[in-house]
């Protein structure tokens, strides 16, 4: 997935609005994913999946950090997330469709917290970005 210059600007603009809320949004994204797509819980059998659990917050922080890292290296997402791609493909063996679920839930969280920022153009750019992140995280499955 190739991001245009406008896409990159839009994605960076959204993440500048997210700012210090990235960890909170990461946890909220996971909570939404676990509820909307309960099959994703199978990768977290050892987690307390209740609302506001410390484990969801901690993993949400990791998700947020990875997304921020991808934004900070938007011209080399594959390089920025290479180790994470290895982890998910070789050790965790996460079903690739789960990255699509995560991306969708992240878009919902952004829409809830920043409705004015999520214009149709920004929505499309953010969706392309999340697809690019998902593609990187599943690239080493082959």
Swiss-Prot record:
Q: What keywords are assigned to this protein?
A: Heme, Iron, Metal-binding, Oxygen transport, Transport
Which Gene3D superfamilies does the UniProt record give?
Globins
Name a GO CC annotation attached to this entry.
Answer: haptoglobin-hemoglobin complex
Q: In which tissues is it expressed?
A: Red blood cells.
Q: Which InterPro entries match?
A: Globin (IPR000971), Globin-like_sf (IPR009050), Globin/Proto (IPR012292), Hemoglobin_a-typ (IPR002338), Hemoglobin_oxygen_transport (IPR050056), Hemoglobin_pi (IPR002339)
Positions with a binding annotation for heme b:
88
Q: Does the keyword Heme apply?
A: yes
Quote any Pfam family the record assigns: Globin
User: GO terms for biological process?
Assistant: hydrogen peroxide catabolic process
**Stretches assigned to the Globin domain:** 2-142
Q: Which GO terms describe its molecular function?
A: haptoglobin binding; heme binding; iron ion binding; organic acid binding; oxygen binding; oxygen carrier activity; peroxidase activity
The record lists O2 as bound by 59
Keyword hit for Transport: yes
Task: Output the SUPFAM superfamilies linked to this UniProt entry.
Answer: Globin-like (SSF46458)
Function, as annotated, reads: Involved in oxygen transport from the lung to the various peripheral tissues.
Annotated family: Belongs to the globin family.
Assembly and oligomerization: Heterotetramer of two alpha chains and two beta chains.
- The name of this protein is Hemoglobin subunit alpha-A
Q: Which organism is it from?
A: Anas platyrhynchos platyrhynchos
Q: What is the lineage of its organism?
A: Eukaryota, Metazoa, Chordata, Craniata, Vertebrata
């Amino acid at each position: 997935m190739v991001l245009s210059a406008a896409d990159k600007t839009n994605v960076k603009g959204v993440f500048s609005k997210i700012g210090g809320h990235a960890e909170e949004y990461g946890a909220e994204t996971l909570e939404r994913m676990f509820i909307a797509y309960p099959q994703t819980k199978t990768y977290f059998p050892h987690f307390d999946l209740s609302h506001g659990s410390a484990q969801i917050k901690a993993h949400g922080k990791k998700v947020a950090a990875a997304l921020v890292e991808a934004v900070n290296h938007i011209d080399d997402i594959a390089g920025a997330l290479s180790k994470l791609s290895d982890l998910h493909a070789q050790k965790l063996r996460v079903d690739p469709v789960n990255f699509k679920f995560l991306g969708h839930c992240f878009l919902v969280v952004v829409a809830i917290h920043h409705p004015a920022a999520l214009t149709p153009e920004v929505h499309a750019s953010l969706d392309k970005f999340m697809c690019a992140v998902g593609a990187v995280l599943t690239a080493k499955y082959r």
